[in-house]
Amino acid sequence: MSTDAPTVASEPRGRALDVIRASGLADLGRGALLRVLGRDPVSELLHVVALLLAVIVIRPLLLSDIPVAHYEAPSIVASLILEDIYNLQRAAVFATPLVPRFLFLIVPTLVFYFTRRRLTWDDWEHGRSMRAAVMVVIGMMAWAGATLPYNVYFDQAHLLDRFLLVFFAAATWSTPLAAPFAARLSILLLRQANFPIGQDTFDYRAIADILVVFSAFVWLSHKKSYHPKHFLLLALAVFGSYYYATGVAKWNFGPPYSWLLENRLSNLTASAYAHGWLSFIPERWFMPLLGFARRFDVPMAAFTLFIEYGSLVAFFLRPSLTRIWILLCALLHFGIFLMSGIFFWKWLVTNLALFFWMRRGGGAEVVRAMCRNALNLAFGVAVIYFSFDRIWFSPQIGVAWYDTRFMEHYEIHVVDAKGSKYLMHPKSFAPGEVHWEQGAFCYATVGERSLTSIYGTVYDYDLFKRIEAIREPKEALALYRQAPICDNPQWRNTFDQFMLRFFGNLNRSGGFQHRWLTWIGRPTHIWLQPQGVLYDGQTPVVRVEVWRTLVLHHQNALHRLEHKRVRSLDIR
């Protein structure tokens, strides 16, 4: 019996295999498997994996901060090179490993030189079409870095560094090998805004990551098997990781669905208006428009989540969907600008550069080649999904809050020797103007309280509901009186040192220097139109005053509850 069982069982199985062979299903299955796991798709995946590994290695080099002493020098680059040479000498003497802060850029460049590998845009298939998109991004970052307003705090123009940035950005048109130099220089110049008071780099961080990807792509292109589709896949993954991370943060914030169904995005617009956005529009005209827009809070929140969550997969499914999604992301940034005056112009320009590149010609061929491989979809989704650890990209984690009707608005006023008072426009503190545009410096006061954060935002659901339940202005004041004191001696001392040095330098120089930089300069991240007599360096400053205004958006009107001087600092 045991010897007959296999024979009986094998007959139907054999007939089934014959049927499959006769029907051609085997050939179809084999063809599908080869398309997904064939030699070319797997080779393509290995190229992208190697590119991601290269990004992990070089990203800390291209994006690393440098000590503040280099910004004190007349030339950032010269100071870095001198330090690198000194440290290399010491490393050789003491046999210790060292990675230079700037001269590391020369190593891969020398590899190309000594191996006689002359890299041009024509070395890549559809490289010329890619050049147009890349040059827009590099040119934009070069414009942002090279036209930063004169740094009054450091009292340095860094003109040589600006020239070098423009030079390497322009040289990128001829040779992609100049792109890593332009990327590093633009980041170095932009990072000076973080001293001495740190500020978020979210307005250009994603673009910096894309430049890291392109720099790694350029250096790996010493091997001629790399193609623009490899770069495009990771460039889109950069954007996808940033959008997806913000969507996840909003969805998981507070009680289930609270950000979607209960948060009021129109409150952000009210706070932005009280802060100075669109202040040239009379309040009697603006508030009715805001009341109408309030009806669309939930649809706007739903659209935001749809775009951000969808970025996990939409960039890699089909060429047409890739183009549509990148355009929807641009539309999202334009909507944020209209609602708040917060202008992610670097993101917007990069979105549009990628869209027009992928729209026709060589770029359309590149995105089709990228989407043709199913492994690219799986890998792109995995890169985005696991990016929260910030090993390869730096997506903003926890970008979620509730927008309330109550706002604490801080302004800087200055007084001259005659007692005349002026309002400081936040952009006068450039290149670190974002911190002053946000207008949240309760830390600089003594004994003052703080109920909400930047633009009236809070991170506590119960506090959000309490503010939303306010029925009359006096309830808002009562709630504010219960808020915690925001006294911070360390931050207050940093604020004092900044003001003393900033206005000390300004008084000695007789006003703002190199104003031509602002004439050709880049747009600011936050747009404000403060109303009042603005200070423009017309007279020496003897005192700095911090003023705080409490504002409540109630019954379609802005109630300014308290306008108070909360700090005064003499300029010696």
Task: Describe the function of each predicted region.
Residues S2-S43, L80-L88, T115-R131:
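Membrane-interfacial, low-structure loops and terminal tails that flank and connect transmembrane helices
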Residues V42-P60, R101-T109, G127-G145, L165, ...:
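Alpha-helical transmembrane segments
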Residues W124-S129, Y226-L234, A364-F379:
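Membrane-interfacial entry segments at the cytosolic side of transmembrane helices
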Residues G127-A142, F154-L190, A237-W251, R295-M339, ...:
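Functionalized membrane-embedded alpha-helices
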Residues L148-F154, N194-R205, F337-W345:
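Membrane-interface helix caps and helix-loop-helix hairpins in membrane proteins
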Residues A237-T246, V367-V399:
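Internal/C-terminal transmembrane anchor helices
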Residues G240, Y244-F306:
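Membrane-interfacial catalytic/cofactor-binding modules of polytopic membrane enzymes
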Residues D403-R572:
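Extracytosolic and intramembrane catalytic regions of membrane-associated proteins
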